[in-house]
Amino acid sequence: MTKFEIECVESTTDGARDHYSKFCLEPLEQGQGVTLGNALRRTLLSDLEGTAIVAVRIAGVSHEFSTIPGIREDVLEILLNLKEVVLKSQTKNPSVGRLRVQGPAIVTTSNLELPSEVELIDPNQYIATICGNNILEMEFRIETGKGYHLIERSIDETSIDFLQVDAIFMPVKKVNYLTKDIRSNDNLLQEQLLLEVWTNGSIDPQDAVSQGGKILTELLHPLKEINFKSDEEDTVAEDSKINQILIEELQLSVRAYNCLKRAQIHSVADLLDYSQEDLIEIKNFGQKSAEEVIDALQKRLGINLPKEKTVKPN
């Protein structure tokens, strides 16, 4: 199998929340470019963890359609601005942040009071404008997660007055890939994979690709040493379980049960040593009891005893 190399061929930063890199992976065998590119793209967009504000409690506000005296934005606009705040956390545990600003002032993310384990990526993100001497005061919950979480209801019933926010956990904003045919030194037709990654600044594209590759490797690793049970092994195991079933579980009549016990027949395995004719010859058993046992074995376990008499070993 061809061993490929990866190289970062381009990297740019357009502000704190817009990082871009292009990677070249080569050489790959024909068809591997699409397989690897698609797997990496889906992993980068859905499986990398990020941090976001998930709920907000604003002083004097009971629902998202409220307005706040002296604040230019309504509550819904403020929630949308908080949704865009990019954070980076050193822990997976939920935490709480706060904000209290007295106007007149333009409120940005630099005014947020964050726990020591949470890092703010862009201190210039706009939140709201306060007119006059009014005060904007809020408390917000911060969590770590994956993907994009839509709110199920506007009010978080687990915490009084908290309004939920559609959380964007994805640190990777966009991924593109392109495959190209190339020729090796031996003139063999191979592939080149070009991978473009855009992130929100909470992670470098290089680190994102590295994490994505690690996730894929760990996901596929069990397939290297996979052991499938043969049908024969499954059949033997199933037969062994059935043989261990006691005759009590067949729910026989008292007469049939006592006769079997006196004949030292305690389990299904013991019954399988008998034919239908053998059962009839058990002392005090009779045709009716034999039919009861035969019917119970067939209906409950799918077992059919042979009709003809067996020869017992001495």
Swiss-Prot record:
One of its GO terms (cellular component) is mitochondrion. Its EC number is 2.7.7.6. Pfam families: RNA_pol_A_bac, RNA_pol_A_CTD, RNA_pol_L. Residues 241-314 are annotated as: Alpha C-terminal domain (alpha-CTD). Residues 1-227 are annotated as: Alpha N-terminal domain (alpha-NTD). It is found in: Plastid, Chloroplast. It comes from the Eukaryota. It catalyses: RNA(n) + a ribonucleoside 5'-triphosphate = RNA(n+1) + diphosphate. Its main location: plastid. One of its GO terms (biological process) is DNA-templated transcription. Keywords: Chloroplast, DNA-directed RNA polymerase, Nucleotidyltransferase, Plastid, Transcription, Transferase. InterPro entries: DNA-dir_RNA_pol_insert, DNA-dir_RNA_pol_RpoA/D/Rpb3, DNA-dir_RpoA, RBP11-like, RNAP_asu_C, RNApol_insert_sf. The N-terminal domain is essential for RNAP assembly and basal transcription, whereas the C-terminal domain is involved in interaction with transcriptional regulators and with upstream promoter elements. DNA-dependent RNA polymerase catalyzes the transcription of DNA into RNA using the four ribonucleoside triphosphates as substrates. In plastids the minimal PEP RNA polymerase catalytic core is composed of four subunits: alpha, beta, beta', and beta''. When a (nuclear-encoded) sigma factor is associated with the core the holoenzyme is formed, which can initiate transcription. Belongs to the RNA polymerase alpha chain family. This is DNA-directed RNA polymerase subunit alpha. It comes from Rhodomonas salina.
